[in-house]
Swiss-Prot record:
Active site: C98
Residues carrying the site annotation Interacts with tRNA: R35, N95, Y176, R272, K274, Y279, R295
Chemical reaction(s) catalysed: 5,6-dihydrouridine(16) in tRNA + NADP(+) = uridine(16) in tRNA + NADPH + H(+); 5,6-dihydrouridine(16) in tRNA + NAD(+) = uridine(16) in tRNA + NADH + H(+)
Family note: Belongs to the Dus family. DusC subfamily.
Residues reported to bind FMN: P7, M8, E9, Q68, K139, N200, G201, E202, G224, R225
Known role: Catalyzes the synthesis of 5,6-dihydrouridine (D), a modified base found in the D-loop of most tRNAs, via the reduction of the C5-C6 double bond in target uridines. Specifically modifies U16 in tRNAs.
Protein's name in the database: tRNA-dihydrouridine(16) synthase
Keyword Iron carried by entry: no
Database matches in Gene3D superfamilies: Aldolase class I, Dihydrouridine synthase, C-terminal recognition domain
Organism expressing this protein natively: Yersinia pestis
Length: 312
């Protein structure tokens, strides 16, 4: 089976990708989206989003990384897709699933699910702009407020020439409600298409991954929030390994704080450290105590000291 690390805006930046790829066996990582409007973005925008471009589009551990684009104008998606691969990205991905109100309000992400023709035009333009040996992939949800057009959407992706399709098994309106997950619909899409389909949504452990693959018939899964809850989730899913012990998680957090300090000591990264702890609290009770201790702290140095005290 293949296991792919999902794009998660505001969460899975290059530093988190680096750490997670060190302790996992991901076959591919997708970046946070790069927003495309009506211009060709400068190279620095691509390098900022995906510093792995300097390393043949791989993390330091060797995991492949693919840039994701978000936008609604086919010609500019194409121009920026061409630049992404020219700079070294291992193909490009088109975001047609982000449920953020801010993103949707500007015509990107899940808004495209309302207009399968626009998905077709965007993916087709990107495919034409990218060399044939490199993948052009698309990530969707089942629809905007229902799954009535899921086949039309999936057909648009395949007919555009996309290499493969990742399907999150909920509509935009479903958000992340666990009870709304629809793996069966992913399976119906997989049966309909000839290109590979990747299943995404509510995969938290080995058992749920096995059940998802059984229901969908997919041999590839994409992990999102669960990859932050359980830092070694790809190994749990692939090999039925136990989840990472808490003290190993602490070592990851210690390294993360140091990486963040090297990059930016501003409140942005402090917020991301706290954000990751928020995810860890769902699986590790110890994370709740640590979160309570650092919640009021304002700089990476103080947070690092708090985390270091755990091993003493």
């Amino acid at each position: 089976m293949r296991v792919i690390l999902a794009p998660m805006e505001g969460v899975l930046d290059s530093l988190v990708r680096e750490l997670l790829s060190e302790v996992n066996d991901y076959d591919l990582c997708i970046t946070e989206f790069l927003r495309v409007v009506d211009q060709l973005l400068p190279a620095k925008s691509f390098y900022r989003l995906c510093p792995e471009l300097h390393n043949q589009s791989r993390t330091q551990s060797g995991t492949l990384v693919r840039i994701q684009l978000l936008g609604q104008y086919p010609e500019w998606l194409a121009e920026n897709a061409a630049r992404a691969v020219a700079l070294g990205s291992y193909g490009v991905d088109l975001n047609c699933g982000c449920p953020s109100k801010l993103v949707n309000g500007s015509g990107g992400g899940a808004t495209l699910l309302k207009d399968p023709e626009l998905i077709y035009q965007g993916a087709k333009a990107m495919r034409a702009a990218v060399p044939a040996h490199l993948p052009v992939t698309v990530k969707i949800r089942l629809g905007w407020d229902s799954g009535d057009r899921q086949f039309e959407i999936a057909d648009a992706v395949q007919q555009a020439g996309a290499t493969e399709l990742a399907v999150h098994g909920r509509t935009k309106e479903d958000g992340y409600q666990a009870e709304r997950i629809n793996w069966q619909a992913i399976g119906e899409i997989r049966q309909r298409l000839t290109i590979p389909v990747i299943a995404n949504g509510e995969i938290w452990d080995y058992q749920s991954a096995q059940e998802c693959m059984k229901v969908t018939g997919c041999d590839a899964v994409m992990l999102g929030r669960g990859a932050l809850n359980v830092p070694n989730l790809s190994r749990v899913v692939k090999y039925n390994e136990p989840r990472m012990p808490w003290l190993e998680v602490v070592k990851l957090l210690q390294k993360y704080v140091q990486l963040e300090k090297q990059g930016d000591t501003g409140l942005y990264h402090v917020a991301r450290i706290k954000q990751w702890l928020g995810y860890l609290r769902k699986e590790y009770t110890e994370a709740t105590d640590l979160f309570g201790e650092i919640r009021a702290l304002k700089n990476s140095k103080d947070i690092a000291l708090a985390i270091q005290r755990i091993n003493r």
